[in-house]
């Protein structure tokens, strides 16, 4: 197993997702270092035998000319991850290369979840607004902030964040230098 397979992945963004939650831009910046060294698994399985990849770098990328539903510049937390390019991972690598395994979801802990309508922190109570509904023309969603921890990213069929997923991949042999992708 002298070869590794490296791929870029969009972990999450500050866009409102399918669960009517979004990360603040500041929380994306807080999550970036927390995801370095975290594992990539399938379907949020917590079995160590299901670990497939590991994140070795993260960065925030502003999507020029694109904005979130609430008018912020769209920013994505992106990562570089690697896995062994061996027989055990061959089918997963083929599925990634073919665009079949593409979507991902993250697991993390956020200390705050503020309602877009009233501004109250749902983690502290005091908000009866329902995410996904409109109140006086304003969409109700929660803004997640104050990152406490990052646990993993998972390959999933339907991610909460529509744009989360694999964006580019590389294969390296022992003769090539992984620094080239940094």
Predicted segments, located by residue:
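Signature of dsDNA virion morphogenesis modules
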Residues: 1-181
């Amino acid at each position: 197993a002298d070869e590794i397979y490296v791929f870029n992945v969009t972990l999450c963004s500050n866009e409102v997702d399918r669960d009517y939650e979004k990360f603040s831009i500041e929380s994306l910046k807080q999550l970036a270092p927390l995801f370095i060294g975290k594992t990539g698994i399938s379907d949020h399985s917590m079995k160590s035998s299901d670990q497939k990849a590991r994140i070795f770098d993260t960065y925030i990328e502003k999507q020029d000319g694109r904005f979130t539903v609430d008018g912020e510049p769209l920013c994505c937390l992106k990562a570089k991850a690697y896995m062994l390019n061996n027989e055990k991972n061959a089918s997963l690598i083929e599925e990634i290369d073919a665009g079949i395994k593409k979507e991902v979801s993250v697991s993390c802990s956020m200390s705050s979840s503020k309602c877009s309508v009233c501004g109250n922190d749902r983690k502290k109570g005091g908000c009866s607004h329902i995410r996904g509904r409109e109140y006086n023309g304003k969409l109700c969603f929660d803004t997640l902030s104050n990152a406490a921890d990052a646990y993993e990213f998972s390959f999933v069929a339907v991610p909460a964040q529509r744009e989360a997923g694999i964006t580019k991949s590389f294969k390296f042999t022992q003769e090539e230098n992984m620094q080239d992708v940094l």
